[in-house]
Regions:
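"A position-specific structural signal for the A-helix of alpha-solenoid helical repeats
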Residues: 7, 41, 48, 109, ...
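Short functional micro-motifs and their immediate structural scaffolds
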Residues: 159-162, 171-174, 189
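Cys/His-coordinated zinc-binding microdomains
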Residues: 155-158, 167-170, 182-185, 194-196
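Conserved structural position within tetratricopeptide repeats
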Residues: 29-30, 91-98, 132-135
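Short coil/linker segments at helix-helix boundaries
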Residues: 48-95, 116-125
Length: 196
């Protein structure tokens, strides 16, 4: 029965029906939690959702900075909407880790989200996650690269994580016209230390 749900979920993905695949992967995982195919499909589909939510949280922060007109070097607290977006992304990541605790891409995303949410308090937790990943898979070259990005405060952006060219807004004003920042491609994150 489970393999049928897995096959249905894969077919839904092929048709581009993400919501149906999401629901079917949950059903397959609930029916047979030890089935490796169901577990892997659940992890992959839910990881895609977690990536979307993580990107949405970053974009919500950028839009909030624009709306509140917060200056580049000014300390700020996230608005409740931004905090909720980060909480949803963290919950989605934890959901994947509940089913596949050794999924390295999900653990990388968790480290990036923890660090991105608050660089000061998130740095030690992110480094702990990444160092455990590096110990588990020393051949993965992406992990040491990410560790180096997180270990050292970025000189380019003053360790804010925001693009120094557009001040984290994703757009620059020239002759009273807003244009997408060419350095960060409108994302508002530092091109040197932006994680994931």
């Amino acid at each position: 029965m489970t393999s049928t749900k897995v096959d249905e979920a894969k077919a839904a993905l092929e048709r581009g029906e993400f919501d149906a695949a999401f629901r079917l992967s949950e059903q397959a995982q609930a029916e047979e939690p030890e089935d490796p195919a169901a577990r892997e499909l659940y992890a992959v589909i839910h990881l895609a959702r977690a990536i979307r939510l993580s990107d949405h949280a970053r974009e919500a922060r950028r839009q909030d900075l624009l709306r509140r007109e917060i200056d580049y070097d000014e300390e700020f607290q996230d608005s409740p909407e931004v905090a909720r977006a980060y909480d949803e992304a963290a919950a989605a990541i934890d959901d994947v880790l509940r089913v596949a605790p050794d999924h390295w891409k999900t653990r990388m995303l968790k480290a990036a989200l923890v660090f991105r949410r608050d660089r000061e308090s998130g740095r030690p937790q992110a480094l702990e996650i990444l160092q455990a990943l590096a110990a588990a898979d020393p051949t993965n070259k992406q992990i040491p690269f990410t560790i180096r990005k997180i270990e050292r405060p970025c000189d380019r952006c003053g360790d804010t994580g925001f693009c120094p060219h557009c001040k984290g807004r994703g757009q620059r004003r020239f002759l009273r016209m807003d244009r997408k920042c060419e350095q960060c491609y409108g994302r508002g994150i530092c091109p040197a230390c932006g994680v994931l």
